[in-house]
């Protein structure tokens, strides 16, 4: 799992799935170093808190910061797990280029929630665990600029899978020992 990117619209289940990936990895390999988890929301909120990114500015800086950190982690032999919306071909290419430059294996994962009522319920009921981060409402999510991602290595529907099942599918494609 040297560089795994988990993307999808807000409230699709990215945070829950990433937490499960880390939990399962720790369970299976308690002595190994876990992947470095880079959350674009955390990075972009820190940039807003610092005044370097205005609340009205479109996200983008967070992706470049995360890619730079990912390059350093990969160069030191570490693994990286990125959680981001990853809405456009531009952001998706950034991760491919980051992995390629580091000579790292790359896995792209798109999470979807095909049940609109469930997706809406999640969006309305979730609470941010990032201080200061205002989560988008359902209307913002449905109006978001998000391009289809047919080239993702794995596309998982979180309305049909639990977070643990999705995490197992991801780990199964990119196990820690490099086997498949």
Residue ranges and their predicted role:
Residues 3:
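Walker A (P-loop) ATP-phosphate-binding motif of ABC ATPase nucleotide-binding domains
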Residues 6:
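Hydrophobic anchor at the beta1->P-loop junction of P-loop NTPases
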Residues 9-10:
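The conserved Walker
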Residues 15-76:
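Conserved substrate/cofactor phosphate-moiety recognition/catalytic segment
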Residues 42-44, 87, 112-118, 160-162:
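Conserved nucleotide-binding/hydrolysis micro-motifs of P-loop NTPases
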Residues 60-106:
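Glycine-rich phosphate-binding loop used to anchor ATP phosphates in small-molecule kinases
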Residues 102-123, 156:
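Conserved phosphate-donor/acceptor-positioning beta-strand/loop module used by diverse small-molecule
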Residues 125-169, 176, 180:
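Small-molecule kinase domains that catalyze NTP-dependent phosphoryl transfer to phosphate-bearing small molecules
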């Amino acid at each position: 799992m040297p560089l795994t990117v988990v993307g999808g619209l807000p409230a699709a289940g990215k945070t829950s799935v990433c937490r499960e990936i880390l939990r399962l990895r720790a369970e299976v390999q308690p002595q190994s170093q876990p992947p470095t988890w880079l959350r674009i929301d955390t990075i972009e909120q820190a940039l807003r808190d610092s005044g370097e990114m205005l609340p009205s500015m479109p996200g983008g800086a967070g992706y470049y910061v995360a890619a730079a950190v990912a390059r350093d982690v990969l160069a030191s032999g570490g693994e990286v797990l990125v959680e981001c919306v990853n809405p456009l071909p531009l952001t998706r290419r950034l991760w491919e280029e980051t992995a390629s430059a580091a000579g790292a294996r790359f896995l792209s994962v798109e999470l979807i929630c095909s049940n609109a009522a469930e997706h809406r319920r999640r969006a309305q009921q979730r609470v941010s665990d990032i201080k200061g981060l205002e989560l988008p409402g359902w209307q913002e999510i449905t109006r978001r600029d998000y391009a289809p991602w047919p080239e993702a290595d794995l596309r998982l529907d979180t309305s049909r899978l639990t977070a643990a099942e999705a995490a197992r599918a991801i780990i199964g494609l990119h196990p820690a020992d490099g086997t498949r």
